[in-house]
A protein has these predicted regions:
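Transmembrane beta-barrel wall of Gram-negative outer-membrane proteins
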Residues: 1-124, 168-195
Length: 261
C-alpha cells in the first residue's frame, strides 16, 4: 500500500486545501486446476482433478486435443489469444483519491468543496450455468442427473477454462459535495449539494469472440471466449441531492426548517 497527503493554506486564514491519495497493488490467485501432462497422469491428485491435457494425447482409441494446441489453433486461424489456462495470478489494483477546499469568505459566509474517487476491481471465474435441458440431450455421453448442471459447468473440477472466460468486475465511485454555511443576524443557513456516480462495468481479456464450450463425456472439457453474461453487463447510478436547512432564533424560541430534493 502506498499513500501520500498534502495540505496547507493557499491564502492565510482565508483559503485552505487538502489532498490525499492511496494505492494498493493487489494480486489475486487464479484457478488451482492444472492440465494433465500425459496419458499416465492420475485423474485426481491431492484433490485436484487433471481433466484436459496440456498437449494433444491419444488414450486408447480416443484422441484428446490439448490446451496448448487449442490456443495455437485459435491464434493461427482467428488471430485470437484465449489467454492462460493454469498457473497464473491476476493483478487487481485499487486506489483512492480525495481533495478538499475550504474558503472563509468572511465572518458570515464559509464554503467548502469536497471530491472523492475510489476504484477497485476483482477477478471472477466464468458463470457456471448450464443448459436447462436434460443432460443426455445436450451433453454428449451424459446421463440424466449425473454429469450435467452444476457438476459439469465451466468451473467444475472436470475441465479447465482459458483466462478469456474470466471477467473483471470494476467498482468505481465518485462523489462531489459542497456546503455553504451563512449567517444573517439571527438566521443561520446551511446549503448542501451532493453528486455521486457509481459505475461498475465488467471487462475481460482477449477481445470480442464467441463464447465457446467444448464438451466431452457428459461434462465440460474446456471453455474460451467471454463469459456469456459479461458483455453489456454494467451498473451506472447517478444521484443528485440538494438540501437547504435554516435556523432562526428569537428569544427563548428556536425555529428550524428546510427542503431537500
Amino acid at each position: 500500500t502506498y499513500g501520500a497527503s498534502l495540505g496547507g493554506a493557499i491564502i492565510k486564514n482565508k483559503l485552505f486545501f487538502f489532498v490525499n491519495g492511496e494505492y494498493q497493488d493487489n494480486v489475486q490467485a487464479g484457478p488451482s486446476g492444472i492440465a494433465r501432462s500425459g496419458a499416465n497422469d492420475e485423474w485426481s491428485t491431492n484433490g485436484i482433478v487433471h481433466r484436459p491435457f496440456e498437449n494433444t494425447t491419444t488414450v486408447g482409441d480416443r484422441t484428446f486435443v490439448g490446451m496448448n494446441n487449442i490456443s495455437q489453433y485459435l491464434s493461427e486461424k482467428y488471430n485470437y489469444n484465449p489467454g492462460r489456462y493454469q498457473g497464473y495470478s491476476l493483478e487487481t489494483p485499487s486506489y483512492k483519491i480525495m481533495g478538499r477546499l475550504d474558503w472563509n469568505i468572511n465572518n458570515n459566509n464559509k464554503i467548502n468543496f469536497r471530491f472523492t474517487h475510489t476504484h477497485s476491481k476483482y477477478s471472477s471465474s466464468p458463470s457456471s450455468s448450464t443448459t436447462p435441458f436434460k443432460d443426455s440431450i445436450i451433453y454428449p455421453g451424459g446421463v440424466d442427473g449425473s454429469a450435467g448442471k452444476s457438476s459439469s459447468g465451466r468451473t467444475s473440477n472436470t475441465g479447465l477454462y482459458f483466462e478469456s472466460s474470466r471477467y473483471m468486475q470494476e467498482q468505481n465511485f465518485t462523489s462531489i459535495a459542497s456546503e455553504w454555511n451563512s449567517k444573517w443576524g439571527a438566521i443561520n443557513n446551511a446549503l448542501r449539494f451532493t453528486y455521486s456516480y457509481q459505475n461498475e462495468p465488467r471487462t475481460y481479456e482477449g477481445g470480442t469472440f464467441p463464447t465457446v464450450d467444448i464438451l466431452d463425456q457428459g461434462s465440460l472439457y474446456t471453455s474460451f471466449g467471454p463469459d456469456p453474461f459479461t458483455e453489456g453487463n454494467l451498473r451506472q447510478v447517478k444521484t443528485f441531492v440538494i438540501t437547504d436547512e435554516f435556523n432562526f432564533s428569537s428569544g427563548i424560541h428556536n425555529f428550524m426548517g428546510g427542503i431537500q430534493f
